[in-house]
């Protein structure tokens, strides 16, 4: 659907070019940056505030890159930029790279974008740049689905192809969604001066005027939504409770927005489920395009981009060995069959038969399924450490929280150290990222969290099993050998909080191997037939907090009190985007997820009955 004509990228689908024949970069700067008075608005930003831009039509990303460059050049420190864009037909890596190569002056910015581009997923993508000061939320979906799902825009770039060639982007309904997603005082600019656009924006509530266009275009439109811009006061201090992946990610997201963060952990860093020797990046997608599907997919893409920043792929701390999700049962075959019909890029996943699955894995497998080439494993404790690199974060271990008390300025946290000495901290906001034990606190007692014990098993590799190159998932998971041992798991025991290793659960983990591979069946039989071998197997137990429906509890529970709880076995992929959601909500910034997903994650909607906590002076 794309072609190059006279050095310009041309869409055969819409019969239009992606950028001006005169100068694509200069046109973007004139129409969108000058048209929205961005230089003046960036320079006048107050500390600890963010400016948000919405765009209809990401295209080559040129508008985003020149906006990012301008913001970094002139915006005061301790300010940030949110850029939201919609693109139904994204360019592939080669097309995007070739297009951006036309502007070498944007090379460093384009290189950063290309690194994230290889991690894009259908639906919503959230990527951070410039040390977290610039955030891009890219919705790869139809504009009619994306626009109703966001809000809080300060300036709009109304791009896309011309109204005559792409009328679906310029309807009255689109303009009403744009107005509804805008803050008071929001502006817009667009290269077109078409009457249908002017009248539609006016009907949506914008004040519209014509000004001189760029190059051969005689006129363009700009305007604003009447009303004074809102005053936004972001918090400056935060306490995060819980030193696992969810807590460390929350601390990192808040610190990147300029908050001073104190992180409390009752044991040592990553001592709970985040302390497993390796963790699996498992993106189990539901077949229906529901909130859970959209959340897991967005989480997966965000997690891969975040890991690229934090953890090297070195085979010790992280491996991008890929994951095979096998059609081992009728139910899984139906789920995988529905997903396989989606026309998605192969770098996200692709269907494979048993023969190709076996070739990818390096051992014979009994089933085909879905191949996720970007998945793999990592060492969760190392990710915890990497997330706490900011000097704005102070870690306190051995601190057990006893109470949370609201105050007129935020929250007071009472804790005990390992010597049972009382300890107290105060901050404007508190983020709770612990396990099921959080229900001992009155403010969180009504959340639907259930303890679930999980046991994983570590099995010495054999000559045959050593050939396994990928993660294999059936009713459980089986990892390639790491330091001479495979990890297999995990059991699920609801309302069981014991932490001792159980031989019967080792046997249960091994039994899952029989169904997916002759090689693993032999390995399972060799170990399972000798009780002494079972008793000598190493492993690890952890207790997670589980919630009904598999959606974690993420968001604001009470004024200034936030949660990121119940991530379950998907925590390695869902904790990062959840941290972004909490931080963006607390700071009044553009949200990284669709509003329907945000509502599905809300702890308020699932706390029952109403939480009896009153704000004290």
Curated annotation (Swiss-Prot):
Gene3D superfamilies: D-Amino Acid Oxidase, subunit A, domain 2, FAD/NAD(P)-binding domain, Vaccinia Virus protein VP39. One of its GO terms (cellular component) is cytoplasm. Keywords: Cytoplasm, FAD, Flavoprotein, Methyltransferase, Multifunctional enzyme, Oxidoreductase, S-adenosyl-L-methionine, Transferase, tRNA processing. InterPro entries: FAD-dep_OxRdtase, FAD/NAD-bd_sf, MnmC-like_methylTransf, SAM-dependent_MTases_sf, tRNA_MAMT_biosynth_bifunc_MnmC, tRNA_MNMC2, tRNA_S-uridine_synth_MnmC_C. Transmembrane segments: none annotated. Its cofactor is FAD. Residues 1-226 are annotated as: tRNA (mnm(5)s(2)U34)-methyltransferase. Its EC number is 2.1.1.61, 1.5.-.-. The keyword Chaperone does not apply. It catalyses: 5-aminomethyl-2-thiouridine(34) in tRNA + S-adenosyl-L-methionine = 5-methylaminomethyl-2-thiouridine(34) in tRNA + S-adenosyl-L-homocysteine + H(+). It is found in: Cytoplasm. In the N-terminal section; belongs to the methyltransferase superfamily. tRNA (mnm(5)s(2)U34)-methyltransferase family. Catalyzes the last two steps in the biosynthesis of 5-methylaminomethyl-2-thiouridine (mnm(5)s(2)U) at the wobble position (U34) in tRNA. Catalyzes the FAD-dependent demodification of cmnm(5)s(2)U34 to nm(5)s(2)U34, followed by the transfer of a methyl group from S-adenosyl-L-methionine to nm(5)s(2)U34, to form mnm(5)s(2)U34. This is tRNA 5-methylaminomethyl-2-thiouridine biosynthesis bifunctional protein MnmC.
């Amino acid at each position: 659907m794309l072609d190059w004509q006279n050095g310009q990228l041309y869409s055969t689908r819409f019969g239009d070019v992606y950028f001006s024949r005169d100068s694509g970069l200069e046109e973007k700067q004139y129409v969108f940056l000058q048209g929205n008075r961005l230089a003046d608005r960036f320079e006048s930003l107050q500390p600890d505030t963010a400016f948000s831009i919405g765009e209809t039509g990401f295209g080559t990303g040129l508008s985003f890159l020149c906006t990012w460059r301008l913001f970094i050049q002139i915006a005061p420190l301790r300010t940030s930029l949110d850029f939201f864009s919609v693109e139904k037909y994204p360019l592939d890596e080669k097309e995007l790279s070739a297009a951006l190569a036309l502007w070498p002056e944007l090379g460093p910015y384009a290189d950063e974008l290309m690194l994230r581009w290889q991690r894009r997923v259908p639906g919503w993508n959230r990527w951070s740049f410039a040390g977290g000061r610039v955030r891009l939320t890219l919705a790869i979906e139809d504009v009619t689905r994306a626009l109703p799902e966001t809000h809080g825009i300060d300036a709009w770039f109304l791009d896309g192809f011309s109204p005559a060639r792409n009328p679906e982007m310029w309807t009255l309904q689109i303009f009403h969604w744009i107005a509804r997603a805008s803050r008071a005082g929001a502006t817009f600019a667009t290269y077109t001066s078409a009457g249908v656009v002017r009248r539609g924006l006016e009907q949506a509530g914008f004040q519209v005027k014509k000004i001189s266009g760029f190059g051969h275009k005689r006129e363009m439109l700009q305007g604003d939504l009447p009303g004074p811009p809102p005053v936004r006061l972001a918090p400056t201090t935060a306490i995060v409770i819980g030193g696992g992946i969810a807590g460390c990610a929350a601390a990192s997201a808040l610190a990147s927005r300029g908050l001073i963060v104190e992180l409390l952990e009752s044991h040592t860093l990553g001592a709970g489920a985040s302390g497993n020797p390796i963790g699996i990046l498992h993106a189990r997608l539901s077949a229906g395009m529901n909130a859970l599907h959209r959340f897991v997919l967005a989480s997966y893409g965000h997690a891969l981009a975040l890991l690229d920043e934090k953890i090297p792929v070195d085979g010790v701390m992280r491996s991008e060995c890929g994951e095979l999700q096998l059609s081992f049962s009728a139910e899984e075959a139906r789920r995988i069959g529905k997903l396989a019909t989606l026309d998605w890029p192969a770098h996200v996943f692709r269907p494979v038969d048993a023969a190709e699955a076996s070739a990818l894995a390096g051992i014979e497998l009994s089933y085909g399924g879905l191949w996720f080439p970007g998945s793999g494993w990592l060492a969760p404790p190392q990710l915890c450490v990497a997330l706490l690199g900011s000097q704005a974060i102070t870690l306190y271990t051995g601190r057990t929280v006893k109470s949370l008390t609201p105050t007129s300025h935020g929250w007071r946290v009472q804790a005990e150290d390992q010597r049972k000495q009382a300890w107290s901290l105060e901050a404007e906001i508190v983020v709770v990222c612990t396990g099921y034990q959080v229900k001992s606190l009155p403010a969180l007692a009504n959340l639907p969290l259930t303890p679930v014990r999980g046991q994983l098993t570590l099995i010495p590799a054999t000559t045959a099993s050593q050939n396994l190159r990928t993660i294999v998932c059936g009713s459980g998971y089986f990892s390639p050998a790491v330091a001479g041992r495979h990890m297999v798991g995990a059991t699920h025991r609801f309302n069981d909080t014991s932490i001792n290793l159980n031989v019967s659960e080792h046997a249960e983990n091994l039994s899952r191997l029989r169904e997916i591979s002759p090689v693993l069946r032999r390995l399972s039989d060799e170990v399972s037939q000798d009780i002494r071998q079972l008793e000598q197997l190493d492993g690890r137990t952890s207790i997670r907090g589980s919630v009904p429906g598999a959606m974690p509890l993420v968001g604001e529970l009470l004024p200034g009190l936030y949660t990121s709880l119940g991530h379950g076995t998907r925590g390695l992929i869902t904790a990062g985007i959840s941290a972004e959601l909490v931080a963006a909500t607390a700071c009044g910034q553009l949200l990284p997820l669709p509003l329907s997903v945000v509502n599905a994650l809300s702890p308020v909607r699932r706390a029952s009955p109403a939480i009896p906590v009153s704000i004290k002076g």
